[in-house]
Amino acid sequence: MAKLKVNPTRMALSELKKRLVTARRGHKLLKDKQDELMRQFINLIKENKKLRVEVEKELSDSFKSFLLASATMSPLFLESAISFPKEKIAVEMKLKNIMSVNVPEMKFVKEEMEGSIFPYGFVQTSAELDDTVIKLQKVLDNLLSLAEIEKSCQLMADEIEKTRRRVNALEYSTIPNLEETVKDIRMKLDENERATITRLMKVKQMLQKDA
């Protein structure tokens, strides 16, 4: 702990006591914020873990279907079949506020062309390729949700660390320093008051002797 360099006056004492009250209130608010951030962060981590398992399984299934399609189709026809996407996809993003953290909300904006989701005819393609396209179509939304949650986790973790540093600074530096300085000024003021009383008593005794 380090005492603050201030003049030991009653005005300084009053000002420091106000700062101490403010620091304690700020510490409580930040600690409450930190606890709530941690609660929401843990929920996001659980959601992220569950969704990641789902996405990895869906992607693995899609890849297996694609391998089967590759085995049953000529490379030329396969490349030609998937070279021209059937729909244009953009990502629309807005922000939502969670405990002063702006986290992303994302969704796909699809510009679909007429007809089916398959970007090819069915004469020279296989059922395995159809299965691959269907599975990839289904996994897209989960992939975007996973990206949204993982970015939110990163932003929340940054805010938790920032809040933790502020809580620790108040708890282990600012508040103890203020408390120590307030205590020191009180002691000095008490000493000054006792010294003043002693001088006054001596003056009174001298006046009484002269009377």
Curated annotation (Swiss-Prot):
Transmembrane segments: none annotated. InterPro entries: V_ATPase_D. This is V-type ATP synthase subunit D. GO terms for cellular component: proton-transporting V-type ATPase complex. Gene3D superfamilies: 1.10.287.3240. Pfam families: ATP-synt_D (PF01813). It comes from the Bacteria. GO terms for biological process: proton motive force-driven plasma membrane ATP synthesis. It comes from Fusobacterium nucleatum subsp. nucleatum (strain ATCC 25586 / DSM 15643 / BCRC 10681 / CIP 101130 / JCM 8532 / KCTC 2640 / LMG 13131 / VPI 4355). HAMAP family: ATP_synth_D_arch. Keywords: ATP synthesis, Hydrogen ion transport, Ion transport, Transport. The keyword Transport applies. The keyword Lyase does not apply. Belongs to the V-ATPase D subunit family. One of its GO terms (molecular function) is proton-transporting ATPase activity, rotational mechanism. NCBIfam families: PRK00373.1-2, V_ATPase_subD. Produces ATP from ADP in the presence of a proton gradient across the membrane.
